[in-house]
C-alpha cells in the first residue's frame, strides 16, 4: 500500500449540520489521505508541524479561519520549511473569510476538488509580535487582525451562543462591547501615524464573511491595509456597517485607510486583540509582512 501523501487535520468534536456531512464525507476519501484529529483548542499547530516532519507536503486544514490560523502557525515554525508545503482548505467555519478571499468553494466536495487539482498561489503571511498571558509572543495571521471593538467582541463572545446561532453570537458580543468605553489607539509606520478608537489590519479584502472592509487589499503584494475609525459609538458603527454592506466604506468620510509593509499599534495594555476571528492577546502589536511566504491550493482561475 502506498504511503499517504496528504495530511488532513480536522476537529472530530465539531457540531452542526455541515460538520455532520463532513464526517460522512470522510469515509469517501482515498487511501492517500491521512486523517489527523485535533485533541484540544490550539492542538492543530503542533499536529501540522509534526505532519511536515513526518514527510507530508500537502497539509489540509478542515475548519474555519481559526483552525486555518492554527495550522499555518504550525507550518511557520522555525523547524518547518513552509515554502516547501502546500496548504489545502476545507471551509467548515462560521465565516470562512480566507476561503472566500481566495475563491475557494464553501462546498466541501468542490473545495476537495481544488486540493486534488493542485493549482497553487503564493500569498503574503503577516507576522505579529504581541502580549499574551504567558508574556511576549510571536505568531502569524492569514487574513486580518484587529484591536479595540472587534478584539473586545471576539474576546468576550459566548462560545455556547456561537454554537447555537453561529455568526449572530458576534453581533450580540459587539453590541455588548459598545457599552464599554473604547480604547485610545495609535499606529506608527515609516511614512506616518494615525490615531483612533478602532483599528483593523487586513492582508486581503474580506472581513466578517462576504464583506469587503479592505477593498484595495491584495494578498500577495507585500502590503497590509490599515483601517482606522477615529471614534467608536453605536451610531458610527451602525453607519459603518451599512457602508460596508454597500461596499462603500472606503468612501465614507469617518474612516481612513493606509497601506503599509510594517507597523506598530499601541494603546492601553489590556486592549484585546483578535486575529482571524479568534482572541490572541493584547497590545502592543508589531506587524510585518513575509511576502508570498505561504503556498495555498486554489481554484485554477486564481492560481499564480
Regions found by a protein language model. Name each.
Residues 189-193, 218, 228-304:
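ATP/nucleoside-binding phosphotransfer catalytic cores, i.e., glycine-rich phosphate-binding loops
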Residues 150-153, 195, 207-210, 234-237:
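Short acidic/glycine-rich loop or secondary-structure boundary segments that cap or lie
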Residues 181-183, 195-197, 220-225, 259-261:
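A generic structural signal for short beta-strands and their flanking turns/coil linkers
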Residues 1-62, 69, 73, 303:
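ATP/NTP phosphate-donor binding region
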Residues 7-10, 38, 76-197:
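Catalytic core of DAGKc-family lipid kinases
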Residues 12, 62-64, 90-92, 203:
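Glycine-rich beta-strand-to-loop/alpha-helix junction loops that act as flexible
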Residues 146, 150, 200-213, 279:
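Glycine-rich phosphate/pyrophosphate-binding beta-alpha loops
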Residues 161-168, 215-236:
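Gly/Ser/Thr-rich active-site loops/lids in small-molecule metabolic enzymes
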Amino acid at each position: 500500500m502506498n504511503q499517504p501523501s496528504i495530511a488532513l487535520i480536522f476537529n472530530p468534536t465539531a457540531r452542526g449540520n455541515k460538520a455532520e456531512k463532513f464526517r460522512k464525507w470522510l469515509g469517501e476519501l482515498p487511501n492517500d489521505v491521512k486523517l489527523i484529529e485535533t485533541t484540544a483548542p490550539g492542538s492543530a499547530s503542533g499536529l501540522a508541524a509534526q505532519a511536515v516532519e513526518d514527510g507530508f507536503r500537502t497539509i489540509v486544514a478542515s475548519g474555519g479561519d481559526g483552525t486555518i490560523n492554527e495550522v499555518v502557525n504550525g507550518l511557520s515554525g522555525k523547524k518547518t520549511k513552509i515554502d516547501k508545503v502546500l496548504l489545502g482548505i476545507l471551509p467548515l467555519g462560521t465565516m470562512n473569510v480566507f476561503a472566500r478571499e481566495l475563491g475557494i468553494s464553501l462546498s466541501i466536495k468542490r473545495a476537495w476538488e481544488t486540493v486534488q487539482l493542485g493549482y497553487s498561489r503564493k500569498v503574503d503571511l503577516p507576522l505579529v509580535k504581541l502580549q499574551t498571558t504567558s508574556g511576549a509572543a510571536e505568531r502569524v495571521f492569514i487574513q486580518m487582525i484587529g484591536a479595540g471593538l472587534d478584539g473586545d467582541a471576539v474576546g468576550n463572545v459566548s462560545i455556547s451562543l456561537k454554537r447555537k446561532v453561529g455568526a449572530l453570537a458576534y453581533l450580540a458580543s459587539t453590541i455588548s462591547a459598545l457599552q464599554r468605553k473604547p480604547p485610545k489607539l495609535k499606529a506608527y509606520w515609516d511614512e506616518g501615524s494615525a490615531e483612533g478608537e478602532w483599528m483593523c489590519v487586513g492582508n486581503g479584502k474580506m472581513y466578517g464573511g462576504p464583506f469587503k472592509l479592505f477593498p484595495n487589499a491584495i494578498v500577495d503584494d507585500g502590503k497590509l491595509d490599515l483601517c482606522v475609525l477615529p471614534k467608536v459609538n453605536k451610531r458610527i458603527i451602525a453607519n459603518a456597517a451599512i457602508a460596508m454592506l454597500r461596499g462603500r466604506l472606503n468612501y465614507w468620510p469617518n474612516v481612513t485607510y493606509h497601506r503599509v509593509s510594517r507597523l506598530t499599534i499601541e494603546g492601553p495594555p489590556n486592549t484585546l486583540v483578535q486575529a482571524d476571528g479568534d482572541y490572541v492577546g493584547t497590545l502592543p502589536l508589531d506587524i510585518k509582512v513575509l511576502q508570498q511566504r505561504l503556498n495555498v491550493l486554489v481554484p485554477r482561475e486564481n492560481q499564480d
